[in-house]
Amino acid sequence: MTKENRKRIIAVDYGTKRIGLAKTDPLQLFAQPVGTFSEEALFRAIKEISGLDGIGRILIGYPLNADGSHNRMTDIVDAFAARVHNEFPDIPLELVNEHGSSRSAGQILINSGLSRKKRHEKGRLDSASACVLLQAHLDKSH
């Protein structure tokens, strides 16, 4: 495996209140949650991951409707993606359809056996949604 391949892939689930972040393991086999952040704290977290592990790609969940059409959040995420690209111009950025990721993440949290109270803690669903996006990308790639 080349050094380039060992860089982490990260996924971002953008929300107007909280932003979920996930990253791969060093072999890019599994997604793991990093946490939930404000936008400013997210940029710091990405810089930290980049400095420690390197980042080979940034995935951003793209909020499309079931029919593939744009919605109110699409423009907001477009603006956010532009800021990410400006801040990290050397890291490839990819928008990935996030339709259904929150629902899938919610089901995973239910199946994990977490209590309802734990499942509804602020940010848990956001970071789980980022993991779902990232794991789906990894599963397609392998």
Swiss-Prot record:
GO terms for biological process: rRNA 5'-end processing. GO terms for cellular component: cytosol. GO terms for molecular function: nuclease activity. The keyword Secreted does not apply. It comes from the Bacteria. The keyword Cytoplasm applies. It is found in: Cytoplasm. Its main location: cytoplasm. Its EC number is 3.1.-.-. Belongs to the YqgF nuclease family. HAMAP family: Nuclease_YqgF (MF_00651). Could be a nuclease involved in processing of the 5'-end of pre-16S rRNA. This is Putative pre-16S rRNA nuclease. It comes from Prosthecochloris aestuarii (strain DSM 271 / SK 413). The lineage of its organism: Bacteria, Pseudomonadati, Chlorobiota, Chlorobiia, Chlorobiales.
